[in-house]
Amino acid sequence: MSRVKRGVTAHARHRKIIKKAKGYYGRRKNAFRTANQAVEKAGQYAYRDRRTRKRNFRALWIQRINAGVREHGLTYSRFIDGLAKAGIEVDRKVLSDIAIHEPEAFKALVEQAQAALK
């Protein structure tokens, strides 16, 4: 059996990691071992924060809806309860967008929610 020298494969693997570490500070960008650790840690942060981003956006939408609803004398939780009782199924992302860009339509939704609460 012939001898397998891994120089080409190893070099390609190192090059791939160094390329991913482009823009990092200090040795992290050009020393393979530290670059490898930095790239792996970056991947862990990215994985974690892709999930955190979903929570952050939901919280932002809720804050925007709450601000819009309070202008009409209602709280967020009462508004959501009113929408559910009125049978209006609109998600928070859309409600947030309506509250910002279409105040008249949002006011109509608030009035429907208030009517359903009574």
UniProtKB/Swiss-Prot annotation:
This is Large ribosomal subunit protein bL20. One of its GO terms (molecular function) is rRNA binding. Keywords: Ribonucleoprotein, Ribosomal protein, RNA-binding, rRNA-binding. Disulfide bonds: none annotated. It comes from Parvibaculum lavamentivorans (strain DS-1 / DSM 13023 / NCIMB 13966). Binds directly to 23S ribosomal RNA and is necessary for the in vitro assembly process of the 50S ribosomal subunit. It is not involved in the protein synthesizing functions of that subunit. Coiled coil: none annotated. One of its GO terms (biological process) is ribosomal large subunit assembly. NCBIfam families: rplT_bact. GO terms for cellular component: ribonucleoprotein complex; ribosome. The lineage of its organism: Bacteria, Pseudomonadati, Pseudomonadota, Alphaproteobacteria, Hyphomicrobiales. Belongs to the bacterial ribosomal protein bL20 family. The keyword Glycosyltransferase does not apply. It comes from the Bacteria. Signal peptide: none annotated.
